[in-house]
Structures are given as C-alpha cells and as structure tokens.
Amino acid sequence: MDNHNSSHQLYKKAMALVLAGGRGSRLYNLTDTRAKPAVYFGGKFRIVDFALSNCLNSGIRRIGVVTQYKSHSLLRHIQRGWGFLRGELNEFIDLLPAQQRVDEESWYRGTADAVYQNIDILRSYGPEYVIVLAGDHIYKMDYSVMLRDHAQSGYKCTVGCVEIAEEEAYAFGIMGIDEDRKITSFIEKPKKNAPTIPGTTDRCYASMGIYIFNSDYLYDLLEEDIANKESSHDFGKDIIPRVVSENQALAHPFSMSCVPRGEGIEPYWRDVGTIDAFWEANLDLAANMPELNIYDKDWPVWTAQEQLPPAKFVPDRKGNHGVITNTLTSGGCIVLGSQISKSLMFSKVRVSAGCEIDQCVIMPEVVVGENCRLKKVVIDKGCDIPAGMVIGEDPIEDAKNFYRTDKGVVLVTKKMIDELKEK
C-alpha cells in the first residue's frame, strides 16, 4: 500500500480532541472575557483556528473541542465558522463542555481529566487512534504524517516535539530520546540539566502538547490515572511519564510534518501564552517575508467570516493621505490620513486623522481618536481610545494606567480605558 492510500485509511480511523478550555492566565486581562484559544490572532483569526485548520487540511474530519473557561465566544465562533462539516459523511466538530463525570462539582482538573470526562463519547465514535491537541499554539502541521509515523512505529503513543535552545527548557516539557527516537525520559519544566538532543549539547526537544495514542491504550491509561488520588491528571506531569516508563513513547520532531517542510525551512511553532509572545507572533506576520505563510492556498487557515465591506484608506479633512506600511488590515476598517507601520488591524477598526501607530495589534471594533501616538500596544476588542492619547512612550504612565510588560509591550482593554476616563 502506498503512502497516500495508507495515510487516507489511517485518518479515517482517527479522531482529534482539541483541548480548548484553558484560561491562559499569563495573557492577563486579554483572557478576562474569553478562553485563550478564543483570543484573536493574525488580523482575522482566533488562536484555535490553527489547530482546527491543521485537522481539516490533514484529512482529520472527526474532531472534538473540549471547552471550559469562559467558553461563550469560543463556542459561538466554532458554531458560526466551522459548521460546514457534513455529518452524513461522518464529519463533525463536537463541542464538549465539562461533563462533571467524576462528581457533580468537579470541572476539568487537568488535561488528562478533560479527556477522561469525555471517554464515553470517544468510545462511541470508535476511533482506532486518538490525536490529542493543544488548542492554543500557532503553527501549521500535517497530522497525517505524524499519524503514519505513529502507526508504522509500533509504539502506543507518539509525542510531537519541537527543537528549542537549552536555556528555554524551563518553560516546557522536555524529553530525552535515543537514536531511534524512543523517548527515554520526560521532565516537566526542568530548572537545570535538561536532556539534550543526541549529538548536541545545547538543543532540546520540547513537547508541543500533541499526542497520538492507540485508543484502547489511552482509555486504560486514563482510567488508571483517574483512580490515582496522588495524580494531577495532566498529560505532561502524569500520563506521558507513565508511557515513557513503559517504553511505549516515540518522539516525532515537528520538522518531519511542518507545513511547508524541506531542507532550509525553519519550522514555525509559537506558544503565544504571554503578552510578549502574543505580540511578537502577531508582528511576525507583518514582515516582508513572514516565517508563517497565511497566504498558502494549499494549506488555508479557516475561520468564521463576517460579511464586511473592504478596508478603506482616505485623506483627512486637510487632504493628508497618510502612509501605511507592513500592516495587515481586515474588512470594515476605515483609516483617515494617519501613519501606520508594522501593525495588524482586525475588522471594523476606525483610525481618525493625525495618528501615528507603530508595532501595534488592534483587535476588532476599536476606535482610535485623532492625533493619537501608539507604539508596541495590544488593544483589546471594543476600546475607544480618546483623542490625543499617547501610549508606549512613557513607561511609568503606561504601567500606571495599563498593563506593561518588562519588554515594553502595553496591553490596553476596554475596562482600563473606561477607568482612565473616570479619573
């Protein structure tokens, strides 16, 4: 059987489970009203769209989305933008809120518990393989390649991993592997002595939060884990170390299945779990030749599409046309005679005359008043920035009025603006 037919048969036997219930507390006020996977990204998308699009483009069309924290906007987004799969062809996206399976007061207590609470639903669909995905990372990956790697290996679990510098290991689950890619150790967020990639002294393999299991093996692991009162019911802390101890875990480097892939191509994967990382990943897209290609017709990023008029750039009352460079602009935006560079504007943004905007991420329905100066600012949905406001130039004022990171990125939310107006 050739690889194409083999992959086709495999993805028909697989079901993906996207874990999209996380709060994302390191994004601070950006997740006050929404779960991290529902946060806006890239000018028109939500973070969860990348994992869901990877599923679709990989041929995986049986998908469960596990939700919990402030899930309304996420549920609405998926219902509006992802309702085109056809149930009569055994295609679906099943929305899975916490089942309170353990007791009537327990919500999801960890990533493994989130899957366990949906174990009956998984069994009812009868997949041979279960693909567990984090719903809060930015990347393009062909899961069918990883699935084929898993099926051909004979291992019962395969863990997607990305190469990182050793000094970054403290933030990830790090795996040690042998020359055949068998995982020999797995350490969650090591502070020192992280296992390095064979043949290197300063590079590590970090877990991407992507796992493929033989389904029966996964069910057994989850049922044993839930009975263990000492467990934190987490894949990285409990399940994967158990699999490694049983010699059943294979490492799958992201470079094998990233899109695109090939010699000289640097795989693009970002954990946008902090304001700085979120801002940087968005601004990556404003580069002349961005590392992440969102214009690839062969691997599109799907999302909910609101019917909006085209963006419009017009001169101000004095006839000043303004200058827009290296900026992504979505439908429904209107910009009057302003200078905007290296920025992203989501839908229905209004920028008044005389503004200077540099390296900003401006979410939907934001109104920027006249003569504002904004630099390195993330502006949440629905903010009304008063005329003449300056953000990003005075660290002390920024920290007093908004949330400012150590790297100088300023987060502005509607609540912050409203409180500032009341002073």
Curated annotation (Swiss-Prot):
Catalytic activity: alpha-D-glucose 1-phosphate + ATP + H(+) = ADP-alpha-D-glucose + diphosphate
Enzyme Commission code(s) on record: 2.7.7.27
Molecular functions per Gene Ontology: ATP binding; glucose-1-phosphate adenylyltransferase activity
Pathway in which this enzyme or protein is active: Glycan biosynthesis; glycogen biosynthesis
Residues the record lists as binding alpha-D-glucose 1-phosphate: Y108, G173, E188, K189, S207
EC main group: transferase
Gene3D superfamilies per record: Hexapeptide repeat proteins (2.160.10.10), Spore Coat Polysaccharide Biosynthesis Protein SpsA, Chain A (3.90.550.10)
UniProt keyword annotations, A-Z: ATP-binding, Carbohydrate metabolism, Glycogen biosynthesis, Glycogen metabolism, Nucleotide-binding, Nucleotidyltransferase, Transferase
GO biological process: glycogen biosynthetic process
Description of how the protein assembles with itself and partners: Homotetramer.
Function: Involved in the biosynthesis of ADP-glucose, a building block required for the elongation reactions to produce glycogen. Catalyzes the reaction between ATP and alpha-D-glucose 1-phosphate (G1P) to produce pyrophosphate and ADP-Glc.
Entry's family note: Belongs to the bacterial/plant glucose-1-phosphate adenylyltransferase family.
PANTHER family tied to this protein: GLUCOSE-1-PHOSPHATE ADENYLYLTRANSFERASE, GLUCOSE-1-PHOSPHATE ADENYLYLTRANSFERASE-RELATED
Protein's UniProt name: Glucose-1-phosphate adenylyltransferase
Organism in which the protein naturally occurs: Francisella philomiragia subsp. philomiragia (strain ATCC 25017 / CCUG 19701 / FSC 153 / O#319-036)
